[in-house]
């Protein structure tokens, strides 16, 4: 695999998907920068996970303040008075959905990237396992890519390595990169803020575990 000599920025939460994307990016770009967001999330330990992973692998890391999002979009990830849905509702999106989150994350990262002369931005969204979140869809990413290019008169390229793969294949990607244990033990995907295997009860933990078991069944025989 040839290495792109350009720089790239990863939208990095410290969770399974974005950490997998971080290593995907390290395989493809000469220099990688990680950007995380503090939006008053209850599972703020994910930011500590992000710091630790970046420190361990000598990756430049920035945390941007997006606390205003908590005031604008009530949801179970930022409000202590709202419990996380254990199961996705039949109609509508789960209460863990944060309106505008991915749009704002990618927009702020794009502003950050342009100031540094960087075009490539990587995000871990997936339409295969998107839990009903509209801002994880491929059509949204493609639309935003065009909008950002027009808004800033700049040629951004939004990469979505996980867009069309499920959690089992995401685990397989980590295995192929030699970072399976890091993803399994050092990331935080749980909506209740528990590192590694998580609480086992929230939708994120259930999806992660289901994917891991499928990965073991398909690829670890």
Curated annotation (Swiss-Prot):
CDD domains: QueC-like. Pfam families: QueC. GO terms for molecular function: ATP binding; ligase activity, forming carbon-nitrogen bonds; zinc ion binding. HAMAP family: QueC. SUPFAM superfamilies: Adenine nucleotide alpha hydrolases-like (SSF52402). InterPro entries: QueC, Rossmann-like_a/b/a_fold. Homodimer. Belongs to the QueC family. Disulfide bonds: none annotated. Its EC number is 6.3.4.20. It is an enzyme of class 6 (ligase). Its cofactor is Zn(2+). It comes from Clostridium novyi (strain NT). This is 7-cyano-7-deazaguanine synthase. It catalyses: 7-carboxy-7-deazaguanine + NH4(+) + ATP = 7-cyano-7-deazaguanine + ADP + phosphate + H2O + H(+). Zn(2+) binds at residues 190, 199, 202, 205. Keywords: ATP-binding, Ligase, Metal-binding, Nucleotide-binding, Queuosine biosynthesis, Zinc. The gene is queC. Binds 1 zinc ion per subunit. The keyword Ligase applies.
């Amino acid at each position: 695999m040839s290495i792109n000599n350009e720089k790239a920025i990863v939208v990095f939460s410290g969770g399974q998907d974005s950490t997998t994307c971080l290593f995907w990016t390290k395989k493809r770009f000469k220099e990688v920068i990680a950007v995380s967001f503090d939006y008053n999330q209850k599972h703020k330990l994910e930011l500590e996970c992000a710091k630790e992973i970046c420190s361990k692998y000598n990756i430049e890391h920035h945390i941007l303040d997006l606390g205003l999002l908590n005031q604008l979009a009530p949801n179970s990830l930022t409000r202590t008075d709202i419990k996380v849905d254990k199961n996705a509702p039949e109609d509508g999106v789960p209460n863990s959905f944060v309106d505008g989150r991915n749009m704002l994350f990618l927009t702020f990262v794009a502003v950050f990237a342009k100031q540094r002369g960087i075009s490539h931005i990587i995000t871990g969204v997936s339409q295969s396992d998107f839990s009903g979140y509209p801002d994880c869809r491929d059509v949204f990413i493609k639309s935003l890519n065009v909008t950002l290019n027009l808004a800033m008169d700049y040629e951004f390229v939004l990469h979505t390595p996980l867009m069309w793969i499920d959690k089992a294949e995401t685990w397989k990607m980590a295995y192929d990169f030699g970072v399976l244990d890091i993803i399994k033990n050092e990331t935080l995907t749980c909506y209740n803020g528990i590192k590694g295997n998580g609480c086992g009860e929230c939708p994120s933990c259930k999806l992660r575990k289901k994917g891991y078991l499928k990965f073991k069944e398909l690829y670890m025989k």
